[in-house]
UniProtKB/Swiss-Prot annotation:
EC assignment: 2.7.12.1
Region named Disordered: 447-467
UniProt key word Transferase: yes
Residue stretches making up the Protein kinase domain: 115-443
Gene it is expressed from: AFC1
Name of the protein described by the UniProt record: Serine/threonine-protein kinase AFC1
Pfam families, alphabetized: Pkinase
Native species: Arabidopsis thaliana (Mouse-ear cress)
Keywords, in A-Z order: ATP-binding, Kinase, Nucleotide-binding, Serine/threonine-protein kinase, Transferase
Length: 467
């Protein structure tokens, strides 16, 4: 009797539990909202609900830039090498890029918790260069922040490949700027470099475009040729050599009397000119660098330093870098760009004014776009084709190359003129190669005669400065 009562009670309890289960469990499932999978990128825009804190015992894998390029890591995974236990809350507020795709920042912001922005160093078509403090290595670095536009991002990845190739073979790190790291931050490729001094162009500009002493030009020219020879040995062509892309390693400089201005009154401080305390330089900006086997029919180089074969469209290769070096050496000696122009016909007319007529065999090979600059075979359509009187004056005021150099160089002028004539030969097949130029008497004679290297401190009254 009692056992039947117990069985009835048990069945009643089971029915109640079954009823509750059928009612409550579906209610809980409907009530529970589905959650989206959280993005693993710490710098993403904040979600509506804060993600759960990561477990303290979990150590995530270490990701590096090259793994992203090879596709081993999905794009939404941020390279964890910049986390290293730093708080993820260090991300600055999410700001939209400007209309040109430049990254918008405020001094004091962080690029990942590792890098804090100190100042803006410069801006170009590629993006911006920011001075940052590396919280991990406790050093100041320069970070190139690329615009968030596909073509610039793709060019940046090519530059990273070139930089890693150059760094891998440059054991001493003395020729080209050293890449420290790279990462993708809010759709901006960021390349971390060692911090260097000002460019040769910036130094000239801040020095009122006063020329460098010939001994300093010799040291700068030797290092520049060594850098380019190193690149050419790796079958790389820089294609954009100019004073803006040559950086002094140190920002320190000194003031010395400028004897050219001592005979007449001038404005504040113009009795003196600045000289770098160290002549050490490094080559930068490899975004336009190309390999020997790639197509070489498009336009390269900044206008003032562009070789004639590029303008004529007859194809270019390693020699286009040597032409640019010749133009740079003239600029360092004189303080002014050799060919200050912005149009092809005027540029070719300036070349003929300084270096003589273009060779007919190059003119006859010119592409269709360049045929309009010539008439009656290989004769340049000048001055008839000049667009203005100012253009005519700009060409006519230029002296021949030997006269131009002798206006600014007191000694070693003969060797320098001969070197420049070899670097500025029209026919690229006859132009000096980088290592051939390094063996020129302009560089070797100083060693044979035991001439000491450039000394920026020859005077007892000097003022040490730092840019």
């Amino acid at each position: 009797m009692q056992s039947s009562v117990y069985r009835d009670k048990a069945s009643s309890i089971a029915m109640i539990l079954e009823t509750q289960r059928n009612v409550e469990f579906p209610h809980r499932i409907v009530d529970k909202r589905p959650r989206k999978r959280p993005r693993l990128t710490w710098d993403a825009a904040p979600p509506l609900l804060p993600p759960p804190p990561p477990p303290t015992v979990f150590q995530p894998p270490l990701y590096y830039g090259p793994e992203f390029a090879s596709g081993l890591v999905p794009n939404f995974v941020y390279p964890n090498m910049f986390y290293n236990g730093l708080p993820r809350q260090g991300s600055p507020p999410w700001r939209p890029d400007d209309k040109d795709g430049h990254y918008v920042f405020v001094v004091g912001d962080t690029l990942t918790p590792r890098y804090q922005i100190l100042s803006k160093m410069g801006e170009g078509t590629f993006g911006q260069v920011l001075e940052c403090f590396d919280n991990k290595n406790k050093e100041v670095v320069a970070i190139k922040v690329i615009r968030s536009i596909n073509k610039y991002r793709e060019a940046a990845m090519i530059e990273i490949d070139v930089l890693q190739r150059l760094t891998r073979h440059d054991v001493g790190g003395s020729r080209c700027v050293q890449i420290r790291n790279w990462f993708d931050y809010r759709n901006h490729i960021c390349i971390v470099f060692e911090k260097l001094g000002p460019s040769l162009y910036d130094f000239l500009r801040k020095n009122s475009y006063r020329s460098f002493p010939i001994d300093l030009v010799r040291e700068l020219g030797r290092q520049l040729l060594e850098s380019v020879a190193y690149m050419h040995d790796l079958r790389l062509i820089h294609t954009d050599l100019k004073p803006e892309n040559i950086l002094l390693v140190s920002s320190e400089y000194i003031k010395i009397p400028d004897y050219k201005f001592l005979s007449r009154p001038t404005k504040d401080g113009s009795y003196f000119k600045n000289l770098p305390k160290s002549s050490a330089i490094k080559l930068i900006d490899f975004g336009s660098t190309t390999f020997e086997h790639q197509d070489h029919n498009y336009i390269v180089s900044t206008r003032h330093y562009r070789a004639p074969e590029v303008i004529l469209g007859v194809g270019w290769n390693y020699p286009c870098d040597l032409w640019s070096i010749g133009c740079i050496l003239v600029e360092l000696c004189s303080g002014e760009a050799l060919f200050q122009t912005h149009e092809n016909l005027e540029h070719l007319a300036m070349m003929e004014r300084v270096l003589g007529p273009l060779p007919p065999h190059m003119v006859l090979r010119a592409d269709r776009r360049s045929e309009k600059y010539f008439r009656r075979g290989a004769k340049l359509d000048w001055p008839e084709g000049a667009t203005s009187r100012d253009s005519l004056k700009a060409v006519w005021k230029l002296p021949r190359l030997p006269n131009l150099i002798m206006q600014h160089v007191d000694h070693s002028a003969g060797d320098l003129i001969d070197l420049l004539q070899g670097l500025l030969r029209y026919d690229p097949t006859e132009r000096f190669k980088a290592r051939e130029a390094l063996n020129h008497p302009f560089f070797t004679r100083s060693r044979e005669q035991s001439i000491p290297p450039f000394n920026p401190n020859p005077h007892p009254f000097l003022y040490n400065q730092k840019n």
